[in-house]
Amino acid sequence: MAQSQNIRIRLKAFDYRVLDTSTQEIVNTAKRTGASVRGPIPLPNKIEKFTVLRGPHVDKKSRDQFEIRTHKRLLDIVDPTPQTVDALMKLDLAAGVDVEIKLQS
């Protein structure tokens, strides 16, 4: 029995709206070229919190808190055609979206 190939795409962004539009572009491109898509699967958000002193001196109890949320999505493209790979290579995604692509057998 022949092994099927999968393309696993992992997307990260600080803004979930930009991430969702980029994910939708990838899904539409893959479906248009004849590949089946599993996902998008939302992965857990990473929340980094930073606490800093508000003033330069004296008030230790006066502090500000900041956080950075990193949103993640996972896509699996099952049995991609050569047209799918070409279309994904030419796809221009929004700035601020980090893309990791792995080819699995």
Curated annotation (Swiss-Prot):
Tell me where the transmembrane regions lie: none
Which InterPro entries did the record assign? Ribosomal_uS10, Ribosomal_uS10_dom, Ribosomal_uS10_dom_sf
Keywords associated with the record: Ribonucleoprotein, Ribosomal protein
What GO molecular function annotations does the UniProt record carry, in alphabetical order? structural constituent of ribosome; tRNA binding
Q: Which GO terms describe its cellular component?
A: ribonucleoprotein complex; ribosome
Q: Name one GO biological process term.
A: translation
- One matching Pfam family is Ribosomal_S10
Superkingdom, natural source = Bacteria
Protein's job: Involved in the binding of tRNA to the ribosomes.
Describe the subunit structure. Part of the 30S ribosomal subunit.
User: According to its UniProt record, which protein family does this protein belong to?
Assistant: Belongs to the universal ribosomal protein uS10 family.
Q: What is this protein called?
A: Small ribosomal subunit protein uS10
Q: Which gene encodes it?
A: rpsJ
